């Protein structure tokens, strides 16, 4: 059984929601990524998304774009990230998901990327710019390696939700707003109605992401989903320029507060 399925099964049995956290691999540097993953797992992260830095991240707002650029400026490349995931796997069995742009996979080589991801212990992929028309091909290849292709749906894509989710696995990433990622003070989408629509088409666990910046927002949205995804608000704390031990403490404090409300 894939680690993602196991995790949602355990959480359901405990009556809890998943805390899914996003960080950019290689920001502030690749070795610190290792420390951050272990630190946030320790205080309650259930699934961790590792963003593979990309020069033109269309789905990302300024916080994650800047984070991606910092990692690129450090020279972080896919082989470095594979190596650090392999290192994480010696210490941790937490579900790990790459958030990766399709062009990065294509340039690296689809087969090579999937094989290496499987070998180091990646459980799933979120590909925000994957055209629906090309989804089938990569889905078939990912299946061969036991890697889940996690569907990404948005409030504007009601007529496409069925198509997007029908072959997805793991969980549905439900984008809470139209536009790009980024911490927000409020979310204007009618979340209850939106999640009902998604539930009409799939029984997979559903996690809400984009714009969740505070424990209060997470608490407000948890009743409509099986999990909450927090990215930009966490990346902001990593980027604040603390020394390493202070940064890790700040990140752990934030994640533990989020976990408490779920």
Swiss-Prot record:
Its EC number is 4.2.1.20. It catalyses: (1S,2R)-1-C-(indol-3-yl)glycerol 3-phosphate + L-serine = D-glyceraldehyde 3-phosphate + L-tryptophan + H2O. The keyword Lyase applies. Pathway: Amino-acid biosynthesis; L-tryptophan biosynthesis; L-tryptophan from chorismate: step 5/5. It is an enzyme of class 4 (lyase). Keywords: Amino-acid biosynthesis, Aromatic amino acid biosynthesis, Lyase, Tryptophan biosynthesis. GO terms for molecular function: tryptophan synthase activity. The active site is at residues 49, 60. InterPro entries: Aldolase_TIM, RibuloseP-bd_barrel, Trp_synthase_alpha_AS, Trp_synthase_suA. GO terms for cellular component: cytosol. Tetramer of two alpha and two beta chains. HAMAP family: Trp_synth_alpha. Belongs to the TrpA family. The alpha subunit is responsible for the aldol cleavage of indoleglycerol phosphate to indole and glyceraldehyde 3-phosphate. This is Tryptophan synthase alpha chain. It comes from Thermoanaerobacter pseudethanolicus (strain ATCC 33223 / 39E).
């Amino acid at each position: 059984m894939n680690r993602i399925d196991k995790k949602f099964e355990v959480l359901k049995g405990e009556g809890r929601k998943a805390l899914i956290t996003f960080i950019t691999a290689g920001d502030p540097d690749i070795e610190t990524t290792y420390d951050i993953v272990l630190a946030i797992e320790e205080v309650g992260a259930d699934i961790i998304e590792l963003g593979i830095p990309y020069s033109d991240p269309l789905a990302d707002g300024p916080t994650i774009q800047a984070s991606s650029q910092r990692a690129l400026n450090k020279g972080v490349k896919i082989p470095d990230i594979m190596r650090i995931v392999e290192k994480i796997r010696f210490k941790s069995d937490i579900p790990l998901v790459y958030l990766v742009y399709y062009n990065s996979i294509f340039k690296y080589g689809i087969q090579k990327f999937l094989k290496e991801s499987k070998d180091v212990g990646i459980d799933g992929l979120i590909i925000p710019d994957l055209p629906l028309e090309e989804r089938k091909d990569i889905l078939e290849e990912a299946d061969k390696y036991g890697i889940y292709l996690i569907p990404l749906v948005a409030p504007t894509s009601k007529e496409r939700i069925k198509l997007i989710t029908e072959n997805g696995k793991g969980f549905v990433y439900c984008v809470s707003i139209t536009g790009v990622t980024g911490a927000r003070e409020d979310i204007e989408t009618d979340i209850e109605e939106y999640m009902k629509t998604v539930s009409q088409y799939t029984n997979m666990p559903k996690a809400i992401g984009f714009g969740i910046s505070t424990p209060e927002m997470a608490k407000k949205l948890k009743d409509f989903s099986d999990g909450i995804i927090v990215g930009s608000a966490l990346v902001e704390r990593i980027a604040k320029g603390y020394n390493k031990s202070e940064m890790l403490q700040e990140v752990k404090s934030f994640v533990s507060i989020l976990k408490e409300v779920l």
